[in-house]
């Protein structure tokens, strides 16, 4: 599979340089309202499964694995912090059941062209658990040849051998959670990972045939400055990733308890 490079024009940058919700899922979060209950969702699935949609397009599926061994203070994701890896087994059983419930409505063998595994930390799962998870999808769906099969990777919990397992399972795209390379920023958000560790993993990923590498970055974190973040950007661009996902940190400690561990006085000014 190859990923086509697209030119981003100045006009496009100007057009979309406005505040707005993150377009990270479909339907977007604001579509989920009380009026859209499980019955309505089931009817939508039935319409696809019974031929109500002529020539349905391939599916794009996101799978969430919420487990992490340690807490990143900036995180607003759905997560479970634990070092007890046995907690993953019942979650995976329920996830398999969820897949079965969906295929009962839409039918077995629907084509998936995009499968993304996010979290949480996907590498919290053992190699066998990852194999089991992928077997569920291969049994219930048809994974399109040349599809995009992506997994989020925490550089602190993966090594070159683990990347080999991910390649063996059919993943062709990796997303590395970097956020910032500055040691002071990493300490402030409780996510310490040396830049050299990420560099080595990116090199190992390319050697194992991964076709697309993404790096996640966050601006607005505590102890960041324009100068320090410029250094991070220089290090990231030197890696020549295929994609950079750059997010603004949203400091909402009243909603997300972990963010209360971040000292407000250490947040950079928006000016």
Predicted feature locations:
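Generic hydrophobic-segment detector
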Residues: 10-17, 32, 66, 108-110, ...
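Short, compositionally biased low-complexity segments
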Residues: 13-17, 70-71, 249-253
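A broad, low-specificity signal for short, low-complexity segments enriched in glycine/proline
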Residues: 17-24, 76-80, 206
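A short secondary-structure junction motif
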Residues: 28-31, 71, 80-81
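C-terminal scaffold of the Radical SAM
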Residues: 51, 55-58, 81-105, 110-271
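Local cysteine-cluster metal-coordination motifs and their immediate loop/turn environment
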Residues: 63-79
């Amino acid at each position: 599979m190859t990923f086509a490079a697209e030119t981003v024009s100045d006009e496009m940058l100007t057009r979309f340089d406005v505040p707005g919700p993150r377009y990270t899922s479909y339907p977007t979060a604001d579509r989920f309202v009380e009026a859209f209950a499980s019955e309505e969702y089931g009817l939508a699935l039935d319409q696809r499964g019974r031929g109500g949609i002529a020539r349905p397009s391939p599916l794009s599926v996101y799978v969430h694995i919420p487990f992490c061994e340690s807490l990143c203070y900036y995180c607003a994701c759905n997560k479970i912090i634990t070092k007890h890896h046995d907690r993953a087994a019942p979650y995976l059983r329920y996830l398999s059941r969820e897949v079965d419930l969906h295929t009962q409505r839409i039918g077995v063998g629907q084509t998936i062209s995009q499968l993304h595994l996010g979290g949480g930390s996907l590498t919290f799962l053992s190699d066998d658990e990852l194999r089991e998870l992928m077997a569920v999808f291969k049994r219930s769906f048809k994974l399109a040849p040349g599809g995009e099969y992506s997994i989020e990777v925490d550089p602190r919990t993966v090594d070159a051998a683990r990347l080999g397992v991910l390649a063996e399972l059919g993943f062709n795209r990796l997303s590395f959670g970097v956020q910032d390379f500055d040691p002071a920023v990493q300490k402030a958000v409780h996510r310490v990972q040396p830049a050299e560790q990420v560099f080595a993993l990116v090199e190992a990923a390319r050697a194992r045939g991964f076709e697309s590498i993404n790096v996640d970055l966050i601006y607005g974190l505590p102890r960041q400055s324009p100068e320090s973040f410029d250094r991070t950007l220089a290090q990231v661009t030197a890696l020549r990733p295929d994609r950079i996902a750059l997010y603004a940190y949203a400091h909402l400690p009243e909603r997300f308890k972990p963010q209360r561990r971040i000292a407000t006085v250490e947040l950079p000014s928006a000016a």
